[in-house]
């Protein structure tokens, strides 16, 4: 399971600066060239619009308008996908993009085939008690594969925060254990919901987002009535997911030609990225697995005085 991206509200492009050494140029000299580095593996999010085809989900009529859950879920998911794809470092898939039926097992199997880091089932709620209203997010329990549960809980909280900000009643983040005593291989209680349980077996968190109650007049007419209001829900989901993964909007600083100074230090410069609170400069020896953070700055330039002639380095900003 992929860990959270560690760059938040800062420049999100990888840039390579090679300090070319012995064998290519005379010893003792420092030479610099800037190139675009290979992209890091993206975060993979699979959105699952609930129901579809013959499975309509909840269906209620208010003030002469019929609210069909399967249609609402799909509209919210499409907006969420569009919004998420504005961020750098994320790949988004949907289990269905039209009005068709997909089994619960195939929904999770699809996510597994795409090597998902997070599975988000998009739903709306219903109750026999028509006064019930508000939003909640279900996440995996803390038993079997505890890290899946803890990551899912954090992702759920991030999404729920955004939904609450829209004015929906905050019904919190919840988990639900099997009602029939089912157990995981380690004998801990199994999750109740199939997509959450199957996702845990597959190794990634599965969430169910219940946006609003189709069975409640005010929820339906205030939050589910029309494309603009459904888009707000999709944007809220995307914002919550982006904040959980620390994604940034897909804007990249452009590295100017590096300057090798007389003292053999190297000066980097890049353009301003709107919305970036700061920039982090990382360096590693070419071919090494890990980067070392050199500096965190609000400026759009940095001079590295720690380079050694004869060594190749790679930088990220």
Predicted regions and their residues:
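Hydrophobic core positions of the immunoglobulin-like beta-sandwich fold
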Residues: 270, 302-305
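Beta-strand-rich modules
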Residues: 279, 304-317
């Amino acid at each position: 399971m992929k860990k959270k991206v560690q760059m938040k509200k800062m420049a999100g492009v990888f840039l390579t600066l090679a300090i070319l050494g012995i064998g290519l140029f005379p010893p003792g000299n420092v030479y610099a060239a800037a190139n675009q580095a290979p992209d890091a593996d993206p975060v993979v999010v699979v959105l699952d619009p609930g129901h579809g085809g013959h499975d309509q989900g909840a269906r209620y009529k208010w003030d002469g308008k019929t609210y069909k859950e399967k249609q609402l879920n799909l509209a919210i998911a499409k907006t969420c996908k569009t919004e998420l794809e504005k961020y750098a470092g994320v790949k988004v898939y949907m289990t269905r993009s039209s009005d068709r039926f997909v089994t619960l097992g195939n929904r999770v199997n699809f996510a597994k085939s795409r090597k998902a880091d997070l599975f988000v089932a998009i739903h709306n709620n219903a109750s026999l008690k028509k006064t019930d209203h508000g939003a909640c997010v279900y996440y995996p329990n803390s038993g079997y594969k505890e890290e899946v549960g803890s990551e899912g809980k954090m992702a759920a909280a991030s999404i729920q925060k955004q939904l609450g900000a829209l004015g929906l009643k905050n019904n919190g983040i919840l988990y639900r254990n099997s009602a029939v005593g089912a157990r995981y291989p380690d004998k801990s209680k199994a999750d109740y919901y199939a997509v959450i349980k199957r996702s845990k077996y597959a190794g990634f968190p599965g969430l169910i987002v219940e946006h609003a109650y189709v069975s409640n007049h005010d929820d339906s007419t205030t939050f589910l009535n029309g494309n603009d209001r459904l888009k707000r829900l999709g944007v809220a989901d995307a914002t919550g997911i982006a904040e959980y993964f620390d994604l940034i909007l897909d804007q990249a600083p452009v590295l100017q030609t590096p300057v090798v100074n007389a003292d053999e230090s190297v000066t980097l410069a890049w353009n301003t990225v709107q919305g970036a609170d700061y920039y982090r400069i990382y360096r590693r020896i070419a071919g090494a697995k890990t980067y070392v953070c050199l500096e965190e700055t609000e400026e759009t330039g940095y001079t590295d005085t720690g380079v050694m002639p004869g060594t190749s380095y790679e930088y990220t900003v």
